[in-house]
Regions:
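N-terminal signal-anchor transmembrane alpha helix
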Residues: 2-32
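Transmembrane alpha-helical segments that form the membrane-embedded catalytic/substrate-channel core
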Residues: 17-27, 97-108, 152-167
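Cytosolic, membrane-interface loops and tails of multi-pass inner-membrane proteins
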Residues: 24-54, 165-176
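Core segments of transmembrane alpha-helices
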Residues: 58-79, 100, 123-128
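Membrane-interface helix caps and helix-loop-helix hairpins in membrane proteins
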Residues: 80-84, 105-115, 135-139
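Structural signature of hydrophobic alpha-helical transmembrane segments
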Residues: 85-95
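Hydrophobic alpha-helical membrane segments
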Residues: 93-104, 115-135, 151-154
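Terminal transmembrane helical module of multi-pass membrane proteins
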Residues: 131-176
Length: 176
């Protein structure tokens, strides 16, 4: 990618990713205190780990949001430095962020209300489309599909790790 394309495609994604992490950090605890029982009931039928909030405490959700931002930040820094595969790594991280954005929107629709990160997820949708179009001109559709699949795997792994951290920290705090 040229320096100009990094400025008008990559940096807005980095900025909205930072805002998304801040939104999750500042709204997660209050949201959890008001919606913990209703979210468990709403997700009884959804076994998929993408949507299940039970077993994930809010500190784990905050950690997952911050780690997601750090992944975008580090891949953007690598893109500035250049090197082998940096564009593809950034595109995969971008697709993972896009999948997480869609997950937040689906969670909000499923719960019929606000979830932490919803506002920036909605704001991200046009920006994701804006960034995905030039990327689709650079790479063929099958490579973009591969990035999306790898991004989905990263998003699922991030949610799975956040759930494990939540369960681990819950058992530690219960034993103290």
């Amino acid at each position: 990618m040229s320096a100009l394309s990094v400025l008008y495609i990559v940096l807005p994604i980095l900025a909205v990713s930072f805002c998304h992490a801040l939104e999750v950090v500042f709204t997660a605890r209050r949201w959890a205190s008001h919606h913990s029982a209703s979210s468990d009931e709403a997700h009884q039928s959804l076994v998929n780990i993408l949507f299940r909030l039970s077993g994930m405490n809010m500190s784990a959700l905050v950690i997952a949001a911050v780690v997601g931002f750090l992944a975008v930040l580090l891949s953007t820094a690598a893109l500035f430095v250049g090197g082998l595969w940096t564009e593809r790594i950034w595109a995969t991280i971008f697709m993972a962020y896009s999948v997480c954005t869609l997950i937040n929107i689906v969670r909000a629709v499923t719960l019929k209300g606000y979830v932490p990160g919803l506002v920036t997820s909605i704001i991200s949708v046009p920006l994701i489309a804006y960034a995905a179009y030039p990327l689709s001109l650079v790479w063929p559709w099958w490579e973009m599909l591969l990035f999306a699949i790898l991004g989905l795997v990263l998003a699922v792994a991030g949610h799975f790790i956040a759930q494990r951290i939540g369960r681990y920290s819950t058992t530690i705090s219960a034993s103290l």
